[in-house]
Amino acid sequence: MAILTNTRSCVTVLAFLSLLFSFSIHAQNTIAPFQTWTDVVRTKPYAESQGVYDNVMTVRRWILTRSEHCTERNRHVLFDMRGNFLDFIEDASDSLQTQQKLNQTRQGMAQQGRVHAWVEGNANTIGYPFAIRCHQPYVDLSLAVSRYLGEHPDGRLSGNWNGISVGTPKNQASLHDVLQTVYKRRVQQKRISLPSNLLPDLAGMLIIESGGVREAKSKANARGILQLTPTALKDCGVPANKHLHRIAQVDCALWLFERNHRMLQPVFLARFGHLPEEKREQVYRLLLIQAYHGGPGRVRSLLTDEEFSKPAAYFAAHHEQFSAGDIAFGMVFHNLGRNRLGFASLYYTADIRIAQQMLASRNIANLASLQQSHLLTSL
C-alpha cells in the first residue's frame, strides 16, 4: 500500500513538473510585440547599420526589375533593421487577409529567434519586420531608360527655354542631351556651381521621377518629367503655361539642386569634412538626393539638430566601419518616424542609384554593339 501511494505521489510530481516545463517553454516562445515600429528603431544600436545600404538596394532592385523573389507581383517581402531580406509571403485574396498573414509571419519569425522583436501592422501602422509589396504598377525601368536615352519616341524633343535651344524638329535631342546642354549653359553663365559628378544623380531622377513621361502628375500635384510642384516651379520662375516644358523642368531641377548644395555643403563639411575624399563625396551625393526628395531643411536637421544629428555624429566618429551608403542611409534609418522621415526617402535614394546602374549598363551595351557594328563594316 505504501509503495502504491509513493508511486502515485511520484506520478503527480512528474506531471506537475512536466506541466510547469511546458508553461516555461510556451512563455519562452511567446514573444510579446513591441508597441510601435519606432520602438524597434530607437532601441537598435547605430553600429547595426552596417550593410543597410547594400541590403536595401538589393530589395529595391528585385522590385524595380521584377527579379528574384519579386518575379511574382502578388507578393510581399519582409526585411529587418539592416535591410536584410528575411522571407516573402504570397498575398492573400484581399489586403486585410494579407495584413493578417504578414503579422502571423512576423510573430513566427520572432518566436523562431530570426528577429529580436515584432510589431503588428495594420492599414495605418507599419509593422516589423518591415514589409514591402513587390508590385509597383507605375514602374517600368527599362522603358524609362529608353526614354531618357531617346531610344523611345516619347523621349525625343526639340525646343527653346530661357536662352537655351535643344535639338531641331528634324534632329531631335534626348533627355540626356537636354541635361548636358542646360548644365553646361548654366555653368558658363555662373548661375550654378554644381560639380559635374552630380549629373548622374540628376539622370537617375529623370528616369525614376516620372519614367520620362512629360505629362506625369502625382496625387500631390507634382508634375512633369521631374515631378516638380507648382510652388517649386514658381520659385524657379517658370510660368504656369510652361510647367510641363521639359527643358524648363531640367533647368528648375538644376536650380533646386544648386540651392540645396549651397545650404547643405557648409554644415555637411562641418560634420563629415574629415572623411576621405571619395567617401565624403559619396555620402554628400546621397544626402543631396534625399534633400531633393524630402527638402533640404529635413536633411540639414540630420546634420545639425541636437537630437536628430546623433546618428550622424556617431557615423562621423566611426566612419571607418561603414560604407558611404551605410552612413547616408543610417542617418535616415535611425530617425525614421520623426521629423516626417519615412521609408520613401530611403527607397527614393536607392531607386535613383539603381536607375544609374541600369543606365550605365545600357550605355556599355550600346557602345559594345556600336563597336561590333563598326568592326563588321570594316571587314
Model-flagged regions — what are they?
Residues P239-Q249:
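A short, structured beta-strand-centered segment in the mid-to-C-terminal lobe
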Residues A2-K217, T231, D251, W255-E281, ...:
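Cell-wall glycan-active module
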Residues A216-D235:
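Short, surface-exposed glycine/acidic/tryptophan-bearing loops
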Residues A222, L244, E277-Q282:
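A glycine-rich, coil/turn loop motif that links secondary-structure elements
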Residues G237-N241, P276-E277:
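Short secondary-structure capping micro-motifs at structural edges
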Residues R285:
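Conserved glycosyltransferase catalytic-site signature
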